[in-house]
Every structure is written in structure tokens, then in C-alpha cells.
Amino acid sequence: MNPNQKIITIGSICMGIGIISLILQIGNIISMWVSHSIQTENQNHHEACNPSIAGQDAASVALAGNSSLCPISGWAIYSKDNGIRIGSKGDVFVIREPFISCSHLECRTFFLTQGALLNDKHSNGTVKDRSPYRTLMSCPVGEAPSPYNSRFVSVAWSASACHDGMGWLTIGISGPDNGAVAVLKYNGIITDTIKSWKNNILRTQESECACINGSCFTIMTDGPSNGQASYKIFKIEKGKVVKSSELNAPNYHYEECSCYPDAGEVMCVCRDNWHGSNRPWVSFNKNLDYQIGYICSGVFGDNPRPNDGTGSCGPVSSNGAYGIKGFSFKYGNGVWIGRTKSTSSRSGFEMIWDPNGWTETDSSFSVKQDIVAITDWSGYSGSFVQHPELTGLDCMRPCFWVELIRGRPNHNTIWTSGSSISFCGVNSDTVGWSWPDGAELPFTIDK
């Protein structure tokens, strides 16, 4: 074979290989296109079916709220966020009024920020309760509230939130003292508003609302903090107010109620800032038929308060002025009472079981569990529950949180903030101890 023939032969072979390669590439492209078309068709078919499936799933996890409280013998620690300790060096919000609420999937800590971070100049003067900079935000329970793990919820200086099994209802009150408005959101979208009806600091729970079979319930107060005010229960469905009822409660004072569902009804234990050192309560059903009273026990739950003694099923006037947000859990004629250890300052915390304290006025009790030592600061406290849809139990698990306030007015700082701890009721071994905030003050910004 002469050189020219060799060249032609080699070229022909190369061209043949190239054509075969091209054909294979074209086949590969066609195969990929066909495969993608099949996948897209399947995906579209799946998405077309998915909404009904998702709707069924959502409906199946609606929180029924008809279970009774779980029987318990004590309280197991559930969370501690150490927000102030972490905030001395990290980016942590200046907050107050934290509370916890759970869906069927998770528990979250809600809190009212001051639009500022700890150890920053904007934390100056944050002892003030109501300002246009305050917002309701939330983060996973047990985490320090920071810009990196928190969700904005609402502009608010008073708030509540709860999950009905299908979405979050949030209530944020903001505006001037003489005309504030509560903005209701459902899954983040504004659904309704409630205007102050007495033009005197409309305010709500500072803890979770209560949901029963798709309806959620909250209590609001409007009027004097040291005299007769007006109190309303609101029934809310998918963020819309469907019914309300004003309490006929002369000589009663309800503020900052801690509410929970129990056997298909709602029980709220509140703060009397007017003239009671024991706590007022209101219970109601889904039709807003209600009953009212005061916890009768001589183990008093408010702060300030007198030493334990003889209680009353009406307001106990001794040391009855002012008060602090708190809670109790009713078990028949018995009651678990959460309270500060100090009778005069917001320090220490303990849980007490009075087996007949809901209806009887003596001061005997059978269980006391230490939560925070009297030498450490505490603050507000409130209840929350974990529904059977979350826990897998056949009962409603009672839980509570305690705010650990630091800064002004008890420390030489320019700021006021807090961290939080929480506990849940169990019918197994528990321990009493002290779980304080633990931050060393003052911070760099204070010096």
C-alpha cells in the first residue's frame, strides 16, 4: 500500500470512528431527553395529587385539645437558653417576656425584643415596657435568641401565640397607650385586628393561647392596672375573631393570663395587679360560657404576697397590690402552684403541690420542688402544654417556663433583659436544684 492509500485508509477509519461517536452522543442525548420527560410527567402527576394528601395530613394533626392533663409527680427540666451569658460576647437580642408554645412538630420560644442586642449602645434604656421598637420573634426552644436563629413574628409590646395543628396564630399589640391595636396573623398573614375598647393599654397574655379542635382562645385586658378593668375572651379560627365575651367580674382583676386546654375546656390562671396576693382564674368552654374565681389556697402564688396562712376564694388583700405574671395547674381539688421564693422581690422559684388548694383555704402542702434559689433572680413565669399529637401520650403534658431577669433595676447596667428555663411534668423521678441565669454583670457596655 503506497503512502497515499495509507493516508486515505487511516482517514476513513478516523471518520468512521467519529461518525459512530456522533451517533452514540445523539442517542445519549435522546435517551436523557426521554428520561427527563418521563420524570417530569411523574412529578407533575405527583404534585397534582399532593395537595389533597397534604390537606388530609394537615387535617389529621389538628390539635384536638380534649385530653386531660397528664398525672404527674414532679417536674423535669426541659430547656435553658443561657441567653445573657452567651450575649456578653455573642449577638443576642435584648428581650423580656419570653414564653414557649408547641405545635404538633416542635416547641418554640417566643420573646419580645427591644430592637437591640446585648452589650450594644441601643440596649440603653430597655427597662421600658412599651416602645415602637419592640417586636415579637421566635427561635427553637433552648437556643439563645439571636439574629441568626430567630424569626420575625409581629411588631408588639404585648403578645401571645399558639398552634392549632394547621398553622400558627400570633397576636401582637402595638401602638399608643390610649389606642393600641392587636394585629392577628395566621401563618404570618394578617387576618384580623382588635382595637383597644377602653383606650387604656390594651394588653394580652405574654404566654401561649389555647387551641381546641381548630379554635384558639385568648384573653385581653383593657383598663387600669390598679383598679377595675375590662376583660374579654376571644375565640379565633384561622386568625379571624369569630366570637368574644366580656367577663362580668366586679372586684376581679385579670392580667397576663396563663391559659391551657384541659378536657375540651380552657383554664386560665392570671395576675391580680389591683388587690389580690392569690391568683384569679377563669375557665370556659368553646361557647365562651365561663366561670370565675380565685385560688383558695393559703399557699399564695403572687408577688408581693404575705407569708402563707389562711387563704380565700376571693382576693386576699394583704400585700395584694402590684403583682407578677404566673401560673398554676388545676387537678381536681388540688393545684400545682408556681411562685417566686421571695415574698417581696422577684427572686427564686419553686413548685408546690397543694392537694386541696383549689377549694380549701389552709396552707398545708405535700410537695415542694426547688427551681431557682432565693439568692438568684427570677421573673415572670407561665404555662404551656405539649399536646398528645406531639408527645404520643394519651394526655396533655403540663409544662412551664420561668423568666430570669437581669440588668436594671437590680444591677448597675444600662439595659434590662432575661434568659429562660422550662420544665415539664412527669410521673417519674425528678430533682430540686437551682438553675439560675448565671451571667456575670456588668458588661463592657456598662463600664
Swiss-Prot record:
Name the major location: virion
Classify the protein's membrane topology as the record does. Single-pass type II membrane protein
Q: Which cysteines are joined by disulfide bonds?
A: C70-C395, C102-C107, C162-C209, C211-C216, C257-C270, C259-C268, C296-C313, C399-C424
| Annotated segments matching region Head of neuraminidase | 69-447
Region Involved in apical transport and lipid raft association, residue ranges: 11-33
Tell me which Pfam families the record gives: Neur
Its recorded reaction(s) are: Hydrolysis of alpha-(2->3)-, alpha-(2->6)-, alpha-(2->8)- glycosidic linkages of terminal sialic acid residues in oligosaccharides, glycoproteins, glycolipids, colominic acid and synthetic substrates
Family in the record:
Belongs to the glycosyl hydrolase 34 family.
Q: What else is known?
A: The influenza A genome consist of 8 RNA segments. Genetic variation of hemagglutinin and/or neuraminidase genes results in the emergence of new influenza strains. The mechanism of variation can be the result of point mutations or the result of genetic reassortment between segments of two different strains.
Q: What is this protein called?
A: Neuraminidase
- What is the species of this protein? Influenza A virus (strain A/Fowl plague virus/Rostock/8/1934 H7N1)
